[in-house]
A protein has these predicted regions:
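Alpha-helical, largely C-terminal catalytic domains
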Residues: 1-215
Length: 215
């Protein structure tokens, strides 16, 4: 019996933003999925817009596993994690130990594949690691936007700081996402969904489909 995937399912119990007042809690499971979606988007943007040759599916997979060590370590607040080089190094060592502990819960023949996912240690993962890092930051900005929209001003400074850190990466894929996609996260469902004309067109099309089924 191997409990690896059962342990991964516990990601939904690990909440992020422990030092912040949240109007809605966010766990590392949902954060990992959002980061994976964004990492895939950044890779696709790079390929289609900037002539890169990223493996978008690999980027998404790396992002899905990027916080798995926190099942063991918990989510350490960023100000604490990066307070000093000594703490950063110590935490990195603990993360490595956590990964090895999780990997030990797999059959021997699967361990290297999942270790590479969890550490981004594959042969082609170097450039993708940067995309995942950017996607991780963008996901954090999205959380800040959502909290601000809910009237919670505790995330205002975090939003400014993380947004600047993304700009400082000088990553065209991330800059493109921030310009073209991020603003819609501040809209209501009605504003996000469709223009009135497009919405009516969809409604008409869906009615036609259902009418055929019901005949």
């Amino acid at each position: 019996m191997y409990p690896f995937f059962a342990m991964l399912s516990r990601m939904k119990y690990i909440n992020r933003w422990g030092l912040m007042r949240n109007t809605r809690s966010e766990n590392i499971c949902e954060h990992s999925l959002e980061t994976a979606l964004i990492a895939h988007a950044l890779a696709t943007i790079g390929n289609e817009k900037f002539g890169k040759h990223y493996d978008a599916e690999r980027a998404a997979a790396l992002a899905m596993f990027h916080d798995t060590s926190e099942i063991i370590t918990g989510d350490m607040p960023t100000p604490v994690k990066y307070h000093s080089e000594e703490i950063r190094n110590a935490y990195a060592e603990v993360e490595e130990m956590a990964v090895e502990h999780l990997v030990s819960m797999l059959p021997e023949e699967l361990r290297q594949s999942y270790r590479a996912l969890m550490t981004m240690g594959g042969e082609q993962d170097g450039e993708l690691k940067t995309l995942v890092k950017a996607a991780d930051k963008i996901s954090a900005v999205i959380k800040c936007v959502e909290e601000r929209r809910s009237g919670n001003h505790d995330f205002r400074k975090a939003e400014q700081t993380i947004t600047q850190s993304i700009a400082d990466m000088h990553l065209p894929e991330a800059d493109y996402f921030m310009k073209e996609f991020l603003p819609s996260y501040g809209l209501t469902l009605e504003e996000q969904d469709y223009t009135r004309e497009a919405g009516l067109k969809f409604a008409e099309s869906s009615q036609m489909v259902f009418s055929k089924v019901l005949k």
